[in-house]
Design a protein with these regions (language model features):
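Structured, non-membrane catalytic/scaffold regions adjacent to prosthetic-group chemistry
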Residues: 2-363
Length: 363
């Protein structure tokens, strides 16, 4: 098993082994395409050591004929494509939920459990088409070799997505990230990339793909990464309880100024990111310094594209004293973020897409 990856100094490490870390706000704000050394890391078990020459992908289940592919065969048999996509952990911004009510046993992820990269690989749909999908396939399951001790019982990581998403042209079996061979830390030699879905569905180190007529039975599909009611007792929940998480909920975050900053009163630049998830796009971001009494519409960077975040910035007047700056995003379906963390609190701390806020002191 490999050790923690080489990362930029200043990463916020929530756990060393297995490695779980996120970049600070300032580092995340520097690049629309996140450098590999800044990209967040989320693991449930030790990272496996895989020789790319020995790696094999087995595709089977409800197919006309199974496939076994080496990396070279995957790269040469199927046309490579590049997709820019944001990955976001379902626990992104969990710290905001924890501030409202404690969530024992979970990492206090801040604003940085999300990053964007250029991914290059084969379309999953092309590989599935080469196998010939059966008529009754509803889900495509992925399995990896990294054993997760937290699973009950301990088992390798896995999950699944609906076949309609799996056969969408944006879903990849990726072997490159930002123009370089995919590192072990980010799932190399090959990982699944499912744009618009929570990061857990973009299974790293994928070694088996199964076409089936039901969602994956893996712990991380049936036990973890499920949205439970606020009053659920996690000690009594059973596999399949709650809602399996898939598409990312509309979200935004303030990256500058940082929480706790001291700054001059008056015009202040506020900047951050917004992400709509699935194939939706961000169309508007508003910023307030008076609790939502008045709003300033932010300027959105670049053109809206599915599967990627949009950076935004606004200039607002910050009065003297202790001031809470908040933001809210709107997407192409006219959905808007919920206001309060209390509204979305849940016992696993997933999907905190309430209004982000930072508190500054102006003088």
């Amino acid at each position: 098993m490999t050790s923690a990856p080489a990362k930029r100094a200043g990463m916020i490490v929530h756990e060393q082994e297995p490695y779980n870390a996120e970049p600070p706000r300032a580092a995340l704000a520097e690049h629309v395409i996140t450098p590999v050394e800044v990209f967040y890391g989320r693991n449930h078990g030790a990272m496996p050591e895989i020789d790319p020459r020995a790696w094999r992908l087995r595709v089977g289940g409800m197919v006309e004929h199974a496939l076994e592919l080496s990396l070279a065969e995957l790269q040469h048999r199927f046309a490579p494509v590049e997709v820019t996509a944001t990955l976001q952990c379902a626990g992104n911004r969990r710290a905001g939920l924890m501030a409202y009510r404690d969530i024992p046993g979970q990492h206090p992820w801040g604003a940085g459990a999300t990053s964007t990269a250029r991914w290059r690989g084969a379309r999953l749909t092309d590989v599935l088409h080469a196998c010939g999908l059966g008529a009754h396939v509803t889900d495509i399951a992925f399995d990896a070799p990294d054993v997760a001790p937290e699973a009950d019982p301990p088992q390798p990581f896995g999950g699944s997505i609906p076949v309609d998403k799996a056969t969408a042209p944006e879903v990849l079996l990726a072997w490159e990230m930002n123009g370089e061979a995919l590192t072990t830390a980010h799932g190399g030699p090959v990982r699944v990339v499912v744009p618009g879905y929570i990061g857990a569905r973009s299974v790293k180190w994928v070694e088996r793909i199964t076409a089936q007529d039901h969602p994956s039975d893996n712990f991380f599909q049936q036990g973890a990464y499920r949205l439970l009611p606020a009053d659920a007792d996690t000690a009594r929940t059973r596999p399949g309880d709650g809602v399996a998480l898939g598409p990312v909920a509309l979200d935004s975050e303030i990256l500058a100024p940082d929480d706790g900053d001291e700054l001059p009163a008056g015009p202040t630049r506020v900047a951050g990111y917004a992400f709509a998830g699935d194939d939706r796009t961000v169309v508007r971001v508003d910023v307030t310094t008076d609790g939502g009494g008045t709003w300033v519409q932010a300027q959105l960077d670049a053109q809206p594209t599915p599967w990627t975040w949009r950076f935004w910035h606004a200039r607002v007047d910050v009065p003297p004293g202790r001031v809470e700056i908040m933001a809210r995003a709107w997407d192409s379906t006219a959905a808007v973020q919920p206001e309060h963390a209390a509204t979305v609190w849940n016992p696993k701390g997933y999907v905190n897409n309430s209004w982000p806020s930072v508190t500054v002191t102006a003088s």
